[in-house]
């Protein structure tokens, strides 16, 4: 007893105890610490961000020992978070931690339907038996599970569920007959553009089926002439609607949540997502644009992230296979998704060269939150490449050692794009907390430790993803945005010396990945940042000017400045907004419920924001590109939608779009670059495979498009006088 009292006093006298301490111990699997904290008075059911509990974190990790300890100490097994609506059982099942799921079911956890379906999928008889024994399982879900089991090959599980279903027959429903011609009118494809999901309705053996891409068809049964249910899926209903005898929409309701899908008519192009899309033979979008003096591309997506390279002689066609319009190709070692920048005859790129045996990188559309467990020794490096020849002009190693944070499988240890003003080159490497400055000839000028930047999942920060916000130069300072689970801030450093100039704390901000943008207006310059709240600061002092919410919980895109307006998007729940904010605002400019504009906001919507790629403002049109290739064009002044299309027919896109001479350039993760005509309708001009993964945003300067793949840096452009294509 005395030893226990001493231990408790020792804990209480060091730092105040909190739910966060308990969450951290549960995530780390520290059994002793969890017990100590509960003994010291921390509530075992303490709720954190989005009402998450320690039990949820332990279940998510599959730590049966911690789960058992928490339940024995009184943890409520049926508490759910308010964001994902998951209980501890849901966390365990979604990660296939079946032993944890079984334990939770044995201790009264609800969620038998999900457990039963998981047991069928995993072929786990014990899990199936526990789910069948749960009073939480209703007859409708039971019979739907039986239909699913019959499609499988596990006879023992099918027999178990069949016996349970026989004992609980469904109440007979009235037979509804839908004429064949009516069912035929429902057949076709339907799409929800915001979610990027397409559903196909077909007639198979006189019955309607519903298919989501990549999944098995589900048979539908009529409940009325226009409403159908899926016997295999509990609480699932589909309703068709339209006007004048034409079916226009399909609404899917599952568990009380509805989503509307628009009927897709036969488009004029297989790439279209709307009737405005067209396809043209490869050709320049404009005739002989005036070639201007070579302009720099000094930062992420060029000057102030505008992404515009007019007058720089960007070509509209090339061929990697034959070498046509490929000036050079230079290998860049390591894994990095940072983008190239250009000043004069120098192209600057960063990389992190790690364990050659671990090249883990996963492209595509997926939602996996688990990081790559590679904390082996890396070398963080800055390269200067000759823009004319592709030769390495110089390379400088910033640091060699182990990264302090993990990375997402679609990320790297060198995500942030460097910045230059023609004399200084500044790079930030978040996973080692280093801000480094060189002159353009590679001479080290200064290096500053800004602290490891630990970006990750807002729900559980131990799922680390890596920092990607890029530095920006403003006058004689370099500014960095450091948003993480705790301790977020915005800071300016003297460009010549690295000396700190100001720091603005962002105490209520969590991990974000966008880069700050400068907006010039009648009241002076504003530094606009994306995040769970959009904020503007005085770039001279760091003083906050205005705030705007709500926004997505994960924000990646960079704000884009136009004339006296800045455009900001977010593409993740709880809202997916597009905001057009006027320069000169002040204070809290959040809109009242139901409003879409105000004195400070030119226009907005809360449903069509995009996730990873940064929007593009070009010739009075705002283009937003979602990660699934959905391109939406808006009148930038009014927000009126001009068209919506699927670039290249869809796919995964991480690189941001750029524009030049009346053309738009889009690079997907598979390594295809699509050239599209700029304007109020979608016209695809060509597709140009690079045959390597592309995550970085291309750059345009002085006759070349610089395209970085995971393995190489390419210069795409008409051959320079006297030069031939070169491969290093």
Tell where the protein language model's regions lie, with residue ranges.
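Ankyrin repeat structural motif
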Residues: 30-38, 63-71, 97-105, 124-133, ...
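Bacterial N-terminal signal peptides
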Residues: 2-12
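The conserved C-terminal loop/turn that links adjacent ankyrin repeats
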Residues: 41-45, 74-78, 110, 136-138
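Noncatalytic, solvent-exposed loop/strand surfaces
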Residues: 272-728
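Ankyrin-repeat boundary/"N-cap" motif
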Residues: 16-24, 47-54, 80-87, 111-118, ...
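Ankyrin repeat A-helix N-terminal signature
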Residues: 24-29, 57-63, 91-97, 118-124, ...
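Peripheral terminal and inter-domain segments
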Residues: 167-279
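N-terminal segments that cap or nucleate solenoid repeat domains
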Residues: 15-50, 54, 127, 131
């Amino acid at each position: 007893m005395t030893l226990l009292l001493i231990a408790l006093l020792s804990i209480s006298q060091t730092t105040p105890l909190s739910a966060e301490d308990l969450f951290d111990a549960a995530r780390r699997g520290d059994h002793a610490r969890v017990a100590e904290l509960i003994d010291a008075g921390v509530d075992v059911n303490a709720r954190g961000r989005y009402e998450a509990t320690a039990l949820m974190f332990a279940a998510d990790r599959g730590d049966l020992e911690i789960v058992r300890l928490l339940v024995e100490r009184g943890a409520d097994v049926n508490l759910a978070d308010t964001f994902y609506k998951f209980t501890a059982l849901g966390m365990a099942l979604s990660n296939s931690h079946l032993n944890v799921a079984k334990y939770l079911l044995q201790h009264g956890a609800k969620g038998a339907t999900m457990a039963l379906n998981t047991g069928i999928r995993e072929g786990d008889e014990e899990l199936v038996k526990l789910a069948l024994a749960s009073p939480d399982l209703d007859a409708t879900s039971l019979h739907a599970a039986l239909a699913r089991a019959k499609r499988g090959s596990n006879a023992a599980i099918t027999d178990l569920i069949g016996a349970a279903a026989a004992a609980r027959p469904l109440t007979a429903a009235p037979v509804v007959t839908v004429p064949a011609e009516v069912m035929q009118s429902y057949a076709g494809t339907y799409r929800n553009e915001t979610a990027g999901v397409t559903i196909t309705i077909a007639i198979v053996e006189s019955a309607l089926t519903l298919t989501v891409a990549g999944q098995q068809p589900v048979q539908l049964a009529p409940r009325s002439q226009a409403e159908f249910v899926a016997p295999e899926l509990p609480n699932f209903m589909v309703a068709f609607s339209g006007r004048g005898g034409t079916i226009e929409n399909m609404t899917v309701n599952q568990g009380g949540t509805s989503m509307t899908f628009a009927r897709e008519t036969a488009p004029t192009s297989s790439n279209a997502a709307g009737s405005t899309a067209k396809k043209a033979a490869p050709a320049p979008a404009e005739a002989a644009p005036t070639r201007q003096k070579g302009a720099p591309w000094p930062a992420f997506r060029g000057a102030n992230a505008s992404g515009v390279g007019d007058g720089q002689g960007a070509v509209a066609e090339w061929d990697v296979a034959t070498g046509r319009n490929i000036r050079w190709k230079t290998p860049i070692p390591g894994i990095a998704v940072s983008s190239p920048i250009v000043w004069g005859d120098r192209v600057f790129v960063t990389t992190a060269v790690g364990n050659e045996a671990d090249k883990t990188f996963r492209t595509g559309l997926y939602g996996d939150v688990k990081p790559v467990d590679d904390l082996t020794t890396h070398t963080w490096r800055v390269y200067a490449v000759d823009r004319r020849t592709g030769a390495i002009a110089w390379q400088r190693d910033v640091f060699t050692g182990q990264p302090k944070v993990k990375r997402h499988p679609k990320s790297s240890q060198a995500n942030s794009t460097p910045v230059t003003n023609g004399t200084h080159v500044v790079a930030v490497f978040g996973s080692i907390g280093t801000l480094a400055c060189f002159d353009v000839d590679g001479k080290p000028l200064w290096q500053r430790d800004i602290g490891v930047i630990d970006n990750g999942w807002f729900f559980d920060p131990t799922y680390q993803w890596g920092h990607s916000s890029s530095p920006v130069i403003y006058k004689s300072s370099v500014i960095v945005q450091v948003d993480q689970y705790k301790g977020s801030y915005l800071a300016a450093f003297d460009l010549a010396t690295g000396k700190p100039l100001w720091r603005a704390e962002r105490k209520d901000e969590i991990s974000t990945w966008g880069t700050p943008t400068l907006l010039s207006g009648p009241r002076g310059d504003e530094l606009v940042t994306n995040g769970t709240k959009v904020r503007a600061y005085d770039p001279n002092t760091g003083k906050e000017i205005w705030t705007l919410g709500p926004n997505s919980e994960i924000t990646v895109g960079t704000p884009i400045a136009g004339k006296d307006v800045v455009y900001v998007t977010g593409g993740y729940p709880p809202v997916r907004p597009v905001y057009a904010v006027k320069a000169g605002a002040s204070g809290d400019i959040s809109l009242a419920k139901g409003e879409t504009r105000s004195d400070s906001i030119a226009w907005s919507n809360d449903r069509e924001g995009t996730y990873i790629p940064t929007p593009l403002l070009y010739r009075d049109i705002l283009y937003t590109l979602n990660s699934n290739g959905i391109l939406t064009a808006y009148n930038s002044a009014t927000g009126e939608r001009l068209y919506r299309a699927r670039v290249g027919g869809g796919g995964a896109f991480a690189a941001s779009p750029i524009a030049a001479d009346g053309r738009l350039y889009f690079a997907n993760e598979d390594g295809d670059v699509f050239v599209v005509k700029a304007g109020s309708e979608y016209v695809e001009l060509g597709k140009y495979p690079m045959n390597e993964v592309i995550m970085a945003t291309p750059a345009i300067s002085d006759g070349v498009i610089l395209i970085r793949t995971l393995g190489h840096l390419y210069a795409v452009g008409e051959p320079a006088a006297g030069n031939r294509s070169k491969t290093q």
